[in-house]
Amino acid sequence: MDPTCQESPAEDSNNEEDLDSTKAAPRIRDTPEDIVLEAPASGLAFHPTRDLLAAGDVDGDVFVFAYSCQEGETKELWSSGHHLKSCRAVVFSEDGQKLVTVSKDKAIHVLDVEQGQLERRISKAHSAPINSLLLVDENVLVTGDDTGGIRLWDQRKEGPLMDMRQHEEYIADMALDPAKKLLLTASGDGCLGVFNIKRRRFELLSEPQSGDLTSVALMKYGKKVACGSSEGTIYLFNWNGFGATSDRFALRAESIDCMVPVTENLLCTGSTDGIIRAVNILPNRVVGTVGQHAGEPVEELALSHCGHFLASSGHDQRLKFWDMTQLRTVVVDDYRRRKKKGGPLRALSSKAWSTDDFFAGLREDEEEAKAPEEVSGESDDDSD
């Protein structure tokens, strides 16, 4: 497998003379090629150490792909059709040997990563369709369902360790603090939930926000919690101040359907308009765009183990890869320049505004001509 997340050594020019002139050298791309599925993927996860990407689609099928920047080397390793309905989430275990999946069919599956064999099935894990999944450690996991139910599981035991229903709507996303003590839940009822999974008790619900909370992430070294919403607003909470928001700001997006942290200050959001936005937290700025799904809603985002690639799934049935190198060099300051209203978002990758992989390299010269600069005026809106 091509070490995609490692820099390739420079080739000796003398070796090139020994190559058969009739053989073209394999093309090395900035990112792996798009993966085309037969149905949109609603679950997406990178392997913790290897160049593998798992996807679960709305037909209930689960796939594992080996990806590479060498053209023609990205390929499917195996697929599984054990779920009866849509696969909602996929997560690799910490050691990368297992893949856990959950589904609208209310089941939890544990698969062997090497062969794709089903090792364990919990058929009726919830009384309602399961919508979200989070692994706590190699044995413990948390699931959330469409009616607001949350269950804590130990794979070495039968039945859930904890079963709570404090939310009134579906559990959209979950996050865990570094100590693996507090579970944070984003729900369709507009509330952020806090659960102590060490003591197996409910702590509190935040005040309801406008619209569904669709995603949750810890930022600023755990000092802030960011929640995306169906109204296109990011809500910020102080750690240990979960009752009410400390800040908020609206993106020029119909919704925020998914969200993934890239650094402690930067995150990426996927929206119904198909645009993947890079957002800085405090100061709150929309830095630019790293890519798009050509007007099709973005369903899920995931960051590779090396941090170089962002993967996205959309309703166009494609899995796309985006280069995060340029985004990581962006510096955001507190000074605000006036930005032309309605202007295009800054492109943060060579194919950010391309609708086809064929055009991936056409913007490279333009982007390279721009020296790295401090971004200070890319916000769509002021924070309250």
Curated annotation (Swiss-Prot):
A Gene Ontology annotation in the biological process aspect, one of them, is:
rRNA processing
Which stretches does UniProt call biased (Acidic residues)? 9-19, 375-384
Report each WD repeat as a residue range. 36-75, 82-121, 125-163, 166-205, 208-247, 250-289, 293-332
Q: Which UniProt keywords apply?
A: Cytoplasm, Nucleus, Phosphoprotein, Repeat, rRNA processing, WD repeat
Database matches in InterPro entries = WD40/YVTN_repeat-like_dom_sf, WD40_repeat_CS, WD40_repeat_dom_sf, WD40_rpt, WDR55, WDR55_POC1
* Entry-linked PROSITE patterns: WD_REPEATS_1, WD_REPEATS_2, WD_REPEATS_REGION
Record has Protease as a keyword:
no
- PANTHER family in UniProt: WD REPEAT-CONTAINING PROTEIN 55
Any Pfam family the entry gives: WDR55
Where are the residues of the annotated region Disordered? 1-33, 362-384
Major localisation: nucleus
Homology family: Belongs to the WD repeat WDR55 family.
Q: What is this protein called?
A: WD repeat-containing protein 55
Q: Which residues carry this modification: Phosphoserine?
A: 354, 383
Q: Where in the cell is it found?
A: Nucleus, Nucleolus; Cytoplasm
Identify the GO cellular component terms for this protein. cytoplasm; nucleolus
What does the UniProt record say this protein does? Nucleolar protein that acts as a modulator of rRNA synthesis. Plays a central role during organogenesis.
Top-level taxon = Eukaryota
